[in-house]
Amino acid sequence: MTLKQLILAASLLFAAAAAHAEQTLDISYQRSSTLWILLKQNGQLEQRLKPLGFTVNWHEFSTGLLSSLNAGSVNLHADVADAFALFTQAADAPLTYYAQENSSPGAQAIIVQDASPIHSIADLKGKTVAVSKGSGSNFLLISALHKAGLTLADITPRYLEAPDGGAAFSNGSVDAWVIWDPFFATQQLEHHVRVIADGNDGLTNYNRFYLATTQFANAHPDVLQITFDTLRETGQWVKAHPRQAAEILGPLWGNIPPATVERANSRRSYDIIPVKLQNLAEQQRIADTYYGAKLIPKPLNVSDITVWTPKP
């Protein structure tokens, strides 16, 4: 073999090895995935994962998020509300919890129009309430009704996703709306609404969880460590720079005014912490409540979930 042939062969082997080493990380996000949206915009996660040979593909979901969680087509998933995470467990989806956003109880609420005769949860009896089925807001509604001595049978729940719920609330076809930020903040600052209950009333903590496919988590703990650290640092940055974060997020959230984004972010903790089984009592309470309300098909033991723990 000539020197030229040796050089060519070596080049081909190097190219093949490089191509083999290059891997794709698929990440899903939704409108409420503040930290993912910022990382997609600033490219910081890609920079940190590049030495490991990873490129990142981002996938936005407005609907069908549960299907994507179950299908395994995404490696790291949009952060989901506490209640929503239970549906993945009920579906036996092979997912690993690798991070948690600490409690943000004020980030969702039950609201009515300012002129409404409804002034308390008890006044919801016989009324129509818009809520996203199976969401964290759904649990807030059930908890609020229970505290007032009512059940879902005492109202007419109208199960609508956030955009449709907003339309129904605006045109008066529902009496109340159970909603989360930034939709909640938009209603407060751009419309005449009143809050009749939120999580600060001791009804729900509203945690959020970050999930990975278990196969990916087992194969790439180094990627999870970098992702966890980057999410935590991004959350700290948002809280330390509220106005700057709002000005970045506003256009990315559909041209929401910075003041609205800032109001919404003020109610989110963005405190990224490890998931610990001993701290999931509220998850078990939600699971039991949802099984009793026939929102999930079977009883769940939340301690059965798979958890990945980051290095300190």
Predicted feature locations:
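Bacterial N-terminal signal peptides that target proteins for export
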Residues: 1-7
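N-terminal signal peptide c-region/cleavage motif recognized by signal peptidases
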Residues: 15-18
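Secondary-structure end/capping motifs
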Residues: 218-295
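Short, glycine-/small- and polar/acidic-enriched structural segments
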Residues: 23-151, 158-159, 175-181, 204
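Pocket-lining segment of extracytoplasmic ligand-binding domains
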Residues: 80-83, 157-158, 163-252
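Small-molecule pocket liners
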Residues: 35-36, 104-110, 193-194, 206-210, ...
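Conserved C-terminal helix/tail region of periplasmic/extracytoplasmic solute-binding proteins
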Residues: 288-312
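Short, solvent-exposed loop/beta-turn-alpha elements that line the ligand-binding surface or hinge
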Residues: 46-51, 201, 270-279
